Amino acid sequence: AADRALAERRPAVRVDVAAELLGRLHAVDRAEDVPELAALAADQAALLRERAQRFAGPLGADPGLLADAAALLDELPRGGRRALLHGDLNPGNVLADDDGAGRRRWRAIDPKPVLGDTAFDAWPVLAQVGNPFAEEDPVGVLRAHARVLCATAGLETDRVAAWALARSCESALWRAAELGDRDAALADLAQARAWARLA
């Protein structure tokens, strides 16, 4: 039977589990009828630029940070190791199955599959395991978790941080445009600034 036991574990254990799971998931490097990350990221970059013109001022956002995020969305899909990605590997999408012999096997659910740079998949796990942005040193926590995840899953820390910066900015402007949620948008922008210190 599946359970949500991952949410009950310490952040370091949760990062280890996610890293091992990403390593297994990324073993597949091709699939039919799966969208390309490059196309998704290009659409997100265009939308980010349009939304930045409307919301950077009202949010007090750094236009340079938003421009960097859009440029990263254009550039990052051209590099990195290519594989089939989960697309939304957040802690709520990681479940444990008992194999009947008392062993637990972790699995991912609710994928939003795309083909592209494996570093793309790390952001939801790193941003949502524990509460790194509420820590006294969020950059230190992110750095430590990213090192563990990248070492186990075979990812490049700088690429993971760059994707996280870009996706945090995209998320911030989505929250502003689609939800009208200024506080959540500002929180995402603060997270993007933390990721910028790692990228």
Annotated model-derived regions:
Residues G87-L89, L165:
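Short, well-ordered beta-to-alpha junction loops that form the rim of enzyme active sites
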Residues D43, V125, W163-R167:
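Short acidic/histidine-centered micro-motifs embedded in hydrophobic/aromatic stretches
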